[in-house]
Design a protein with these regions (language model features):
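Function-dense linear segments that define catalytic or interfacial modules
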Residues: 360, 366, 374, 378-407, ...
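Conserved "right-hand" nucleotidyltransferase catalytic core of DNA-directed polymerases
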Residues: 226, 230-339, 347-356, 413-593, ...
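Active-site-proximal helix-loop-helix substrate-binding element of RNase H-like nuclease domains
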Residues: 152-176, 183, 323-448, 472, ...
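Extended two-metal-dependent nuclease catalytic cores across DNA- and RNA-processing enzymes
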Residues: 22-23, 73-249
Length: 837
């Protein structure tokens, strides 16, 4: 038998701290529950164990605490946000049929050791899943540790232990007895680190062997003195660090076979936690709708009916598991073919859909506009809870308590679809967000469908040539790196790069973290003054990213018509921003000369020209309006340079005396204030001391008290209401503000400050897209809206329509709302995106 034992506490902590704080719309924390399930599902898929045990620590002291008062004394308590999730997670695991085990006075590690020994004695093998290296001492021919790291799970068998540490797995206990363990407050021998401990145990075999050979010349005098003076601590540490294999628990591996559990209860709980995708991953689709009462009559089963020749009234539309659309009216279910469905989309009927964008695209491809579409349940669910992990009919029905009106094998969700859409509509009305759906999100779905259909032409030959030049440059960069280091290695490997920089070249800092040397961008930037190879490495990363993500990505995405057809997503960003994928056109780089060249390969079609309109400083204009600051408003009304004007106001100097350095500082603060940046972040942006940045910030807030007051009011309002709103009424819940964790709470405060501004900017560009798209159609132009990126719209137009399109873009974008500060746009024209922008 193959038994998998999970170190529950280790993995749930990794899940909690590895995923941003998530909550349900009623404020329950869920990130640890969500992350733990993903870890478990991935382990099950990868290793397919016969039985699974999940081991937990008890909150009571253990025999180790009795032996040593200081054991784990330096650890902080469990965060309240995690503690609230633990009973829910354990209930869910029980409903899913997993056997959980814990024992007062013993640790989860001892349960892992006991079950591994018992399984081996029974002739089986054991997989121990943990993020804690303590369990590596248990590795043998029948026991493998699946060590969870930030990026991957690494199988550690005896050979892997020997390769990494140069000793046998049980000898890791001896190593810990010498070096100690700060995380568990195991003392070890003061002054003996990991490197020395490994060398001594490798030489003498064990802790006892070290002391038996204390006078050996291999033991340096300083080490000898430390070892001799601290023998008692070494022995204590050996006891504390040894995982026991005799915990009084059930040791028959068969006792940990997965149980039937309660699938319906699991599905209900997952739905209540708004983990819709996990309902599917656990295979619980059949049990998610609320169970009818015991006395309820059995559901009537209906078969699909022929669609009436002239459909009238309201229909509800969604896709079944095969991707086929079905319609529901009363207790009638219809499965129309594509042509019939397209005809209905522009008929006199009324259609309430769940995910309208594909239907809009179908209508557009058939020469219509989808005029029958009046509601989108998926978009409604997103507006009600933009933080949800997914939006599926069956899960939302369970979440909102919608019971099936009938059963239909061809469309299992058909019985709840109408009730769900009606319930979501009522909830949307109650929240005051129905106007957002009717006038912004639903019309925008049509616009996005059209943009997906049209696509954006690319110069594939130019991209290939650009890729070839990047590869050539990369070869030269790698040669420069290898020459400086003195040997070739995998520059993409953080481990090998760290060894090259810090061990071979001796660059500071020499400090390691748990995964080895840090080689992230921030670390490399700090090393620039020490060796020119750092510039080459940073350049390598830039070129490699351009090549793999953008050059190869765009060429792979090119369709037969020579265009890339991105998919635009409305239900992903919590701020209301649109995102795109396959390919992601929102992140085409523009900040570097090399990256911006990519825009030169997005081209207008034959006989066409690109017209690009970009809002000018839209977020600062919203800030000026929303705070009511007279100086900022006047600067925009006068068409002044807002950053120069701000600087002059702060320092009481004429604008013509503002230096570039002072203007840069004010610009950083103008934008940084919206993102909740403090002195430390500003100091990094400006390359100045923290104290100087703090002075800039305080002077700014003293000069613009209405800005300071607005930011404080945002936080107070969000704490009181539990959410923030854009000027259009879009809501975003902020449970982070109630967190006991300072960093999480500070993050919530930053979101409270910037969401109304960022979210309002997102709403404005969305509404502008709807207006521009409709205006182009109303004026019967051939011009087509191709793309939205942040505050920028790109239209493809025939040469003879350029002036008209420029006028439409300016009129619609600048007049989409009327605030105390005017919105302005900059419009450009060109054959490529680079030329037009």
């Amino acid at each position: 038998m193959k038994l998998m034992v999970l170190d529950g506490n280790s993995l749930v902590n990794r899940a909690f701290f590895g995923i941003k704080l998530l909550t349900t719309k009623d404020g329950r924390y869920t990130n640890a529950i969500y992350g733990f399930q993903n870890i478990l599902l991935n382990l099950l898929a990868a290793h397919k164990p016969d039985a699974v045990a999940i081991a937990w620590d008890e909150r009571a002291p253990t025999f180790r605490h009795t032996a040593y008062d200081g054991y784990k004394a330096t650890r902080h308590g469990m965060p309240e946000e995690l503690a609230q999730q633990m009973p829910v997670l354990k209930e869910l695991l029980t409903d899913l049929g997993f056997v959980q085990v814990s024992k007062a006075g013993w640790e989860a590690d001892d349960i892992l050791g006991t079950l591994a020994a018992a399984c081996e004695a029974a002739g089986g093998t054991t997989l121990l899943a943990t993020g804690d290296r303590d369990s590596l001492q248990l590795v043998d021919d029948a026991t493998t540790v699946l060590l969870a790291t930030n990026k991957e799970t690494i199988p550690m068998d005896p050979a892997a232990i020997r390769e990494k540490y140069g000793i046998e797995p049980p000898q890791l206990i001896d190593v810990k007895s010498l070096m100690g363990d700060a995380s568990d407050n195991i003392p070890g021998v003061p002054g003996i680190g990991e490197k020395t401990a490994l060398a001594l145990i490798s030489k003498f075999g064990s802790l006892q062997g070290v002391y038996d050979n204390i006078d050996d010349k291999a033991v340096k005098p300083g080490q000898r003195a430390k070892l001799t003076a601290n023998r008692d601590k070494a022995d204590l540490s050996y006891m504390l660090g040894t995982i026991r294999k005799d915990a009084p628990i059930e040791t028959d591996p068969a006792a940990y076979l997965r149980q039937p559990g309660d699938p319906a209860a699991a599905a209900q709980l997952l739905a209540a936690l708004e983990m819709h995708k996990l309902v599917d991953r656990w295979g619980l689709n059949g049990g998610t709708a609320p169970a009818p009462s015991e006395n309820a009559a059995p559901l009537e089963t209906v078969e699909p009916s022929p669609l009436p020749l002239l459909p009238e009234g309201r229909f509800y539309a969604a896709r079944n598991a095969d991707g086929d659309w079905y319609l529901v009216q009363g207790q009638d279910v219809y499965l129309p073919d594509t042509d019939r469905l397209a005809a209905i989309l522009d008929s006199g009927a009324e259609l309430w859909a769940f995910d309208a964008k594909p239907l809009y695209r179908l209508a557009l491809e058939h020469g219509g506009i989808g005029s029958a579409l009046r509601f989108d349940g998926k978009l409604a669910a997103y507006l009600l809870n933009p933080s949800a992990s997914g939006y599926e009919v069956h899960s939302l029905a369970a979440e909102y308590g919608v019971h099936a009106a009938f059963a239909c094998e061809a469309a299992p969700d058909a019985g709840v679809l109408a009730g769900l859409c009606d319930t979501l509509a009522a909830a949307l009305d109650e929240s005051g967000q129905r106007k957002l759906l009717d006038e912004m999100e639903l019309p925008l779905a049509r616009v996005l469908a059209d943009m997906e259909r049209i696509g954006f032409a690319i110069d594939a030959d130019g991209i290939r040539a650009f890729g070839d030049s990047l590869r050539s440059e990369l070869d030269g960069i790698l040669n420069n790196i290898y020459t400086t280091v003195g040997y070739s290695f995998n520059v993409n490997s953080p481990k090998q790069l760290g060894e090259a920089l810090f061990d071979k070249l001796g660059l500071p800092p020499r400090k390691k973290n748990a995964r080895g040397y840090s080689t992230d961008a921030e670390t490399l930037e700090s090393l620039r003054p020490y060796n020119q190879v750092i510039d080459e490495i940073l350049k390598y990363r830039t070129y490699a990213k351009l090549l793999s993500t953008y050059v190869d990505g765009l060429l792979n995405a090119e369709a037969a018509d020579g265009r890339v057809h991105s998919t635009f997503i409305q239900t992903e960003a919590r701020t209301g921003r649109i995102s795109s994928t396959e390919p992601n056109l929102q992140n085409i780089p523009i900040r570097t000369e090399l990256g911006s060249r990519l825009r030169g390969y997005f081209v207008a079609g034959a006989g066409e020209t690109l017209v690009d309109a970009d809002y000018s400083q839209i977020e600062l204009r919203i800030l000026a309006h929303i705070t009511g600051d007279e100086h900022m408003q006047q600067a925009f009304l006068n068409g002044a340079d807002i950053h120069r004007s701000t600087t002059a106001k702060i320092y009481h100097i004429p604008e013509n005396e503002v230096t570039p350095q002072l203007r840069s500082a004010s610009k950083a603060i103008n934008f940084g204030i919206m993102y909740g940046k403090g002195a430390y972040s500003l100091s990094k942006d400006l390359g100045i001391p923290v104290k100087e940045a703090d002075t800039f910030l305080k002077t700014y807030l003293d000069t613009f008290p209405k800005v300071d007051g607005y930011m404080k009011d945002c936080i107070a309002h969000a704490k009181d209401k539990g959410y923030v709103e854009t000027l259009f009424g879009r809501r975003r819940a902020l449970p982070e503000l109630a967190s006991s964790n300072f960093q999480v709470r500070a993050s919530g405060e930053r979101m409270a400050r910037n969401t109304p501004i960022q979210g309002t900017a997102a709403d404005i560009i969305k509404l502008a897209m709807v207006h521009v798209w409709q205006r182009l159609r109303d004026e019967k132009l051939q011009a087509r809206l191709l793309l939205q990126v942040h505050d920028e719209l790109i239209v493809e137009a025939p040469e003879e329509e350029i002036d008209e399109v420029k006028r439409i873009l300016k009129e619609e974008m600048e007049n989409v709302v009327h605030y105390s500060v005017p919105l302005t746009t900059e419009v450009g024209v060109g054959k490529t995106w680079l030329e037009a922008h």
